[in-house]
Amino acid sequence: MPKMKTKSSAKKRFKVTASGKIKVAAAGKRHGMIKRSNKFIRDARGTMVLCEQDAKKVIQHYLPNGL
């Protein structure tokens, strides 16, 4: 059976760190920022690390070979 391919959309959205954690951009920034608090906007600026349960699902389904 051939190797499972990495999903192209996942390559653009997720980055795997050296320790195996998965970094993603913070959600909720596409529109409607005018009514958000300054703290929300500031916190959503950077990236975040997925929890272990979500990271396991992402690796299993979308990034079988890593990046």
Curated annotation (Swiss-Prot):
Keywords: Ribonucleoprotein, Ribosomal protein. InterPro entries: Ribosomal_bL35 (IPR001706), Ribosomal_bL35-like (IPR021137), Ribosomal_bL35_CS (IPR018265), Ribosomal_bL35_sf (IPR037229). GO terms for cellular component: cytosolic large ribosomal subunit. One of its GO terms (biological process) is translation. SUPFAM superfamilies: L35p-like (SSF143034). Coiled coil: none annotated. GO terms for molecular function: structural constituent of ribosome. PANTHER family: 54S RIBOSOMAL PROTEIN BL35M, LARGE RIBOSOMAL SUBUNIT PROTEIN BL35M. Belongs to the bacterial ribosomal protein bL35 family. This is Large ribosomal subunit protein bL35. It comes from Bartonella tribocorum (strain CIP 105476 / IBS 506).
